[in-house]
Curated annotation (Swiss-Prot):
Domain TB: 33-106
Gene3D superfamilies xref list: 3.30.60.30, TGF-beta binding (TB) domain
Domain of life per record: Eukaryota
Signal peptide range: 1-32
GO terms for MF: activin binding
Taxonomic classification: Eukaryota, Metazoa, Chordata, Craniata, Vertebrata
Ranges where the Kazal-like domain occurs: 103-169, 189-244, 267-321
GO cellular component terms attached to this protein's record: extracellular region; extracellular space
Tissues where the protein occurs: Not expressed in the organizer region. Expression in gastrulating embryos is confined to anterior and paraxial regions, which give rise to head mesoderm and the first five somites. In addition, expressed transiently in a subset of cells in the posterior notochord anlage. Later, expression is seen in brain, eyes and somites.
Descriptive protein name: Follistatin-A
Length: 322
């Protein structure tokens, strides 16, 4: 290059300028690496987002957890890191502090015990006016609405407040918000639902449902509407029109369900049978319609499936208590 510059007889100042430009271009060359969505507890980068990306591009989003590795390695090495090594080594997190970290609504950035920035649930409860317990859409009672919002943040995005106060077994004293109506479901829990006054026209006979009350409903919408107006759950016995069955042998259940015979009403209904039940606590015991105490409602349903007969909860607790 010097020989070429001498041949052109350039001014010494111009030669120095060219050398300086070459240095700048070489020094500012973008270094490609790999962008990752998170750094694991083992300190390695995990969940590859994009290979061949500079650190500046990778960290531009400001997302907490995004990390970068500078090694430009073949795909086979990336695969080995992810599958066998628990992630990529020499992991450089984009964020070392909580500065400019956007955790999204209902969350805030907080430094953990290992001095790492982490997004934690911190819902805005400043607009919550009711300070007492609330019943959630999952049927659980929460200490207050703020506690429910924290649970919603921690992986239950569909969780909402059903009504104020503890969850109840009847619609008595339940005040539903807006135009929603209180309905008692099949598990004897009170819920607030919105009643559809108009159902779309039935296009196929496959939409027919036989209700647990022995009435044929044109569609699931029609059954829900009847449930709303009645104020308690009707439930689906089986798909199709109701038939005069002599036993469960006459009833066809869809896959994964078994027919249970209701001797009292002389009709059957299809139910999902659980293979196993979680360990139950003493307060979960129920008294069933056969006057037997079961450790839990799940255990009662298991017994019903084994016997092939319908069992329902008479009341919570032991049969000897009432």
């Amino acid at each position: 290059m010097l020989r070429m510059l001498k041949r052109q007889q350039l001014h010494p100042g111009m030669i120095l300028l060219l050398f300086w430009l070459c240095y700048l271009i070489e020094d500012q060359k973008v270094q490609a690496g790999n962008c990752w969505l998170q750094q694991g507890k083992n300190g390695r980068c995990q969940v590859l987002y994009m290979p061949g990306m500079s650190r500046e591009e990778c960290c531009r989003s400001g997302r907490l957890g995004t990390s970068w590795t500078e090694e430009d390695v073949p795909n086979s090495t990336l695969f080995r890191w992810m599958i066998f090594n628990g992630g990529a080594p020499n992991c450089i997190p984009c964020k070392e502090t909580c500065d400019n970290v956007d955790c999204g609504p209902g969350k805030r950035c907080k430094m953990n015990r290992r001095s790492k920035p982490r997004c934690v649930c911190a819902p805005d409860c400043s607009n919550v006016t009711w300070k007492g317990p609330v019943c959630g859409s999952d049927g659980k009672t929460y200490r207050d609405e703020c506690a429910l919002l924290k649970s919603k943040c921690k992986g239950h995005p569909d969780l909402e407040v059903q009504y104020q106060g503890k969850c109840k077994k009847t619609c008595r004293d339940v005040l539903c918000p807006g135009s929603s109506t209180c309905v008692v479901d099949q598990t004897n829990n009170a819920y607030c639902v919105t009643c559809n006054r108009i159902c779309p026209e039935v296009m196929s006979p496959d939409q027919y449902l036989c209700g647990n009350d022995g009435i044929v409903y044109a569609s699931a919408c029609h059954l829900r509407r009847a449930t709303c107006l009645l104020g308690r759950s009707i439930g689906v016995a089986y798909e199709g029109k109701c038939i005069k069955a002599k036993s469960c042998d006459d009833i066809h259940c869809s896959a994964g369900k078994k027919c249970l015979w209701d001797a009292k009403m002389s009709r059957g209904r299809c139910a999902v049978c659980a293979e196993s039940c979680p360990e139950s606590r003493s307060e979960e015991a129920v008294c069933a319609s056969d006057n037997t105490t079961y450790p839990s409602e799940c255990a009662m349903k298991q017994a019903a499936c084994s016997l092939g007969v319908l069992l329902e909860v008479k009341h919570s607790g032991s049969c000897n208590c009432k």
